[in-house]
Amino acid sequence: LNERTVWGVSLGGNFSRQKENAGMFTEIQEIGVAGNTYSYAEQNRNNLSVGTSMVHKLKREGGELSASFDYFHYYRVGNQLMDSFKPDTLKGDMKGNTDLYVGQIDAVYPLSEVWKLQAGVKTSFVTIDNTAGYMRPSVSGWLPDGALGSRFVYDENINASYLQVGYEKDRLKISAGLRLEHTHVHGDFGGNTQQKDSSFTTNYFHLFPTIALQYGLTSEHLFQLSYGRRITRPNYGDLNPFTYIFDDYTHEGGNTKLHPSFSDNIELGYVYRDWFQTVLFFSHTDDAIMKSYREQEGRRIYVMPQNLSSYVQTGMRVHAANLSPVSFWKVNLTAIGIYNNYGWTEQGQKMKNRMFTPIFGCMNQFAFTSVWSAELSANYNGRMAYGQATVHPALEVNVGIQKKMFRNRCTVTLFAKDVFNTNYQKVDIQSPGVQAFVDERHNKRVLGIAFSWRFQKGSDTKESRRKKEIDETKRVNL
């Protein structure tokens, strides 16, 4: 608009059509039950986002005032047929709508050459409307199953404000902040023959302090220390009480009684010459949201999210960036060691699941010429404790090649993910009354091509800060 004021508009969307055929084998040794179930599913997803933002530079150098508003719409419709060649064959139709509105205002004001003040407010509104219906075959045709499906409507409003002050002089940087949040939630469940119709309303206030300290011992050696308290809210789909049927022996559903988890996080880091970093970290979480596995009716596993009483994570992360064995080859290496310790109570028994896990990552970048480049990455996760479950090791290898054309205005990329189809999930579950082993062999390999065209040469548009802060979009798992 002028030399100090910039206004922007963004529009995005994606549309997908997906079909999936799957086979599932279940064996329950104690009661001598075994069977195969075949699932045929089809899903259509339409997502839309619209946003506008304005940034105004104040006359005082370093001062800035910004405001933004974003709207997101997520729509999903799907149908599924589960055939076990027995009378328990089931057909389901599901539909979901999510509307998200987010607005925020932020201000940055330098108090002096060494002191800076930041403040802001944010509000968000979320509305979810999900319906599901199931039918079973009979001599007279398909008839509704009144024990499954219904309608679930969920409304959420979050209002937040924050204040942060920063100090920077010579080799020392200090920042401290405080965020206040108020959350209002209301949900309605239509009920069915197995569950009564119900509703719930929740209101709560919480404070979240943060503090960070950074000190440069010399120009090459930097030390960092930080503390922050965080909130993790349930994904919207995890609150949905509908039951998803894998087969007659495995059901999964949401939990309307889920509440947020709160964590205290401490990190101590050391950086050498901007290319080598090592971090010691510690996190303690109350009411961690994890999947639980329960026996139902002596013949079925019911999977649902629940709050575990405690979760403690400690570990060390080492990262080396931009290593260059030869002129055209750059390597980024990451090694992480994590110790997870979960605790909860089930059927009057105190349960524990704790384990050390190694994680490794390697990213290779090759610049063969000014227009040809390639990437090769590999990631390995070791055996890991995850709530009530133990997850087996997994490996993924990705590769891509890129060509720039037409004076670098056009870029064509050919990529492949999980080249060797090794990133599958294998899980062991043990809890009172339940011992289960899950082996999911989804084919996650992807071969794709991407094309981009830059219409005008100039400075790259920086990603708006607000996009990174819209946490509500990460909670949509319809």
Whereabouts are the PLM-identified features?
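Surface-exposed extracellular loop regions of Gram-negative outer-membrane beta-barrel proteins
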Residues: 75-77, 129, 141, 184-189, ...
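Residues that define the transmembrane beta-barrel architecture of outer-membrane proteins
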Residues: 44-48, 97-101, 155-159, 203-207, ...
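Outer membrane beta-barrel strand-and-loop segments of large Gram-negative receptors
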Residues: 100-104, 146-149, 255, 259, ...
